[in-house]
Amino acid sequence: MKLAILSRNSSLYSTRRLVEAARARGHTVRILDPLRCYMRIAADGFSMHYKGRPMTGVDMVIPRIGASITRYGTAVLRQFELMGARTPNPSDAILRSRDKLRAHQLLAAKGIDMPVTVFGDNPDDTVDLLSMLGPPPHVVKLNEGTQGRGVILTEKASASRGIVEALRGLYANFLMQEFIGEAKGADLRCFVVGDQVVASMQRQAPEGDFRSNLHAGGTAVAAKASRAEQQVAVRSAKALGLSVCGVDLIRSARGPLVLEVNSTPGLEGIEAACGVDVATRIIEHVEKLKKP
């Protein structure tokens, strides 16, 4: 199988591990910087060039598209899809996952539980918007923030109003959620490949913080996901159309709640914490996706 990995940095752990796993299973692999891919779109067909040469015959594309290049990266991936390449995470599915509001709407429509979420635009509606959410603490999230950036905890209603006013003044797109205190700064990352959770780890926020993301200073240990948690993770992936993703859950008094579905989850933290060869599981999965 001729496999392309869309990644801006060939030295990243996740990219290197996918290359190693694919080559170990006999596949031809090439790393492509999405920003060096350019395309021709016409009624007579689609074509792609990379650094001055045509890209043809690609069977499978594994996207490792960073948030900062989501639009261009997904356009490149879509072009490969239109040229007949397969992918575990289609371009439209990645776009669904990157828009937190859209993702929450789609998950809720499938009956998947999550922290109560509110969204509004007009400053005149702020007081009523907060009443729909309930009493503080509240969590304010930028709609397209990643790795724990752009997430704020407010402990008083006045602070929530102040943050809302400040973000609107910056024309920022954001949503607000209830704070789940019983989680105690911990969440569960379930790594979904296909229709199963292949590894899971508990991430704990550092002292004095509530964000458990590893990039925000959190720590991780292997953790067993319950049957219910695994089912929620797989359902969440399917709701967005992803077959390789990280689903972040928190354990609450009313059961597992979905925080986020990450379409480009890192491999380093989960492989180190769990001792699972996740990269090979991904390659085994994409082998099944290839057309016979």
From Swiss-Prot:
UniProt cross-references to Gene3D superfamilies, sorted A to Z: 3.40.50.20, ATP-grasp fold, A domain (3.30.1490.20), ATP-grasp fold, B domain (3.30.470.20)
One GO location term (cellular component): cytoplasm
Annotated ranges, domain ATP-grasp: 104-287
EC top class named in words: ligase
Binding site residues for Mn(2+) 1: 248, 260
Cofactor field: Mg(2+); Mn(2+)
Protein name, entry field: Probable alpha-L-glutamate ligase
Keyword line: ATP-binding, Ligase, Magnesium, Manganese, Metal-binding, Nucleotide-binding, Protein biosynthesis
GO molecular function, one term: ATP binding
Residues bound to ATP: 141, 178-179, 187, 211-213
Co-factor note (free text): Binds 2 magnesium or manganese ions per subunit.
Binding site for Mn(2+) 2: 260, 262
Signal peptide: none
Family: Belongs to the RimK family.
Entries under HAMAP family matching the protein: RimK
Pfam families (alphabetical): RimK, Rimk_N
Residues reported in the UniProt entry to bind Mg(2+) 1: 248, 260
